[in-house]
Amino acid sequence: MNKTYDAIVIGGGHAGIEAAYALAKRAFNVALITLNINRLAMLPCNPSIGGSAKGIITREIDALGGMQGYFADLAMIQIKMLNTSKGPAVWSLRAQIDKEKYCQIILDDIKKQSNITLIEDEVVDLIVNENQCHGVVTKENGNISAKVVVMTTGVYMNSRILRGTDIKYDGPDGEKTSSSLSKNLMKYGFEILRLKTGTPCRIYTDSIDFSKVEKEQLDKNELSFSSHSNVKLDEQTCCFLTHTTAKTKEIILNNLDKSSLYSGIIIGIGPRYCPSVEDKIVRFQEKETHHIFFEPETAKGDIMYINGLSTSMPESVQDQMIASIPGLEKARVQKYGYAIEYDAINPLNLYKSLESKTLSNFFSAGQPNGTSGYEEAAAQGLIAGINAANKLDKMPMMEIKRSSAYIGVLIDDIVTKGTNEPYRMLTSRAEYRLLLRNDNVDERLSQYAFENKMISAQSYNKVLDKYKLINNEIQKLKDEYVSSNSELAKKYNVTSGVSKLKLLANPAVDPKDILGNDFPYLDEITIQVRLFGYLKKQESAAEKMFRLEKLKLPIDLDYNLVENLATEARQKLNQIKPTTIGQASRISGINPADIQMLMYYLNNRKK
């Protein structure tokens, strides 16, 4: 077996797959070391990709040359656009995925990649010399050397599965866990966090009484995540809606002392925005019911994922809870819900490139950085992979602005503010969310992708041509006026002197009446025109912030030398080592007076 590679990726989950593909796309030889090569990119938590904000992240991954959206399209059994009753800033795709097909597609495809080598093994330590990472130590194959290492271990570091007092030292779904790596990371200066997540039970579909639940109504559509998958679903697989009952609430409250979460067995901190059912019952006791969704795990549909019933209760209590829910009175359980605790590193140790501040050539991505979700993991894996490749190519690190992508918001948040709970992306976290829409990911990110060798010149020019066509059409509409005796004027009560552009800006107007059925980018141009004033305001605000991002801070700056800084500011700046004034301004506890002192200090240094 080869023992030397350009790059090593530790872990074959969603982050690891993106990192490996990014490095391979850049023509580097990659060793992808994972505990089970037949379980690549598992979907152990839920059988879906996307969701509010998350779907936009998957689209951003695609625009940057990543793979998640492409593979999701190939394995999806349902897709829909969320939040369509609201403004386009929060429209986001969500797809139900055939979880077995998804893993198989990725395994088959990765085996075709000549410069990715799959190695089934456990990484137990790093090879480190003078604060530089030079490879990994594995349990079965010993030392494997590389110029860069990307850690994407998911929830597998020192993980344990909990149901009541029943504890198993396993990874998700009974997979192996990695018991040594996080312990060894501490000796290289990493602070280890203990976090928690969970998953609900799975039920055999033929044991569900569907007469007691509500079937989701879905229209056929031509939606997809990827711009190059060319996949359109012929048929949508439906989900179903039911709810907890007063009996469910009673069972949970009477058995709280048996929950791993409430009995004190769990020490890890769980995700705030994805609570267990017992957590929901306790926190929202005024509510008598909570929504429960049945989601098929595969195209076969023989197993249902019971969304909304995540729990760490013992199996006997779960049986009672399940039987109290309409439609599940006689349900047969395929797998019980559980909580999982795992180790992660403090992401304040990382630069925006996702390279460690204390261990050169070592990058980290995904859940070991304190985030939750397949989409957040894949996004970080892609950025870490691109920047690891940039390091090998001696190119500048790629740092995506907050005003350019949710991915930029995600990474800036975790490396600037840190986290003590699994971080989930929300639209509310983005101050420029009108700019970060589902429809314009290619416009926002294609230049990043092209400059970092992730898409071809042909692909990049195709995007430039698209927006040139849109801008030309906008100018044309601006110059064309609606004739007072035209059908258009009669339909919309238009008097003379109204341009077609102004008419298109009216939400009551059907864009096809102005642009026809054949204009290829109907949604994009309509959104641009109707949000024009709001977009200009956000672009102006983003530009002001970007001026602060241009003011670089030296990595080796000793903030004890900066006069008149508050003590808290001095401590946090020395810990986080922000790279720009803009990043420094977003650290909690840093106030405007501290920023003024920093800028004054920088100006004096230049003199």
Curated annotation (Swiss-Prot):
Gene3D superfamilies noted in UniProt: FAD/NAD(P)-binding domain, GidA associated domain, C-terminal subdomain
One BP annotation, GO: tRNA wobble uridine modification
PROSITE patterns in the record: GIDA_1, GIDA_2
Chief location of this protein within or outside the cell: cytoplasm
A GO cellular component entry from the record: cytosol
Coiled-coil parts of chain: none
Cofactor (UniProt): FAD
Taxonomic superkingdom: Bacteria
Residues noted as binding NAD(+) in the record, renumbered to the chain: 270-284
Stretch forming the signal peptide: none
Entry keyword set: Cytoplasm, FAD, Flavoprotein, NAD, tRNA processing
Binding-site positions, FAD: 11-16, 123, 178, 367
HAMAP family for this protein: MnmG_GidA
Subunit structure: Homodimer. Heterotetramer of two MnmE and two MnmG subunits.
Biological function: NAD-binding protein involved in the addition of a carboxymethylaminomethyl (cmnm) group at the wobble position (U34) of certain tRNAs, forming tRNA-cmnm(5)s(2)U34.
NCBIfam families: mnmG_gidA
Name of the protein in its database record: tRNA uridine 5-carboxymethylaminomethyl modification enzyme MnmG
UniProt organism field: Metamycoplasma arthritidis (strain 158L3-1) (Mycoplasma arthritidis)
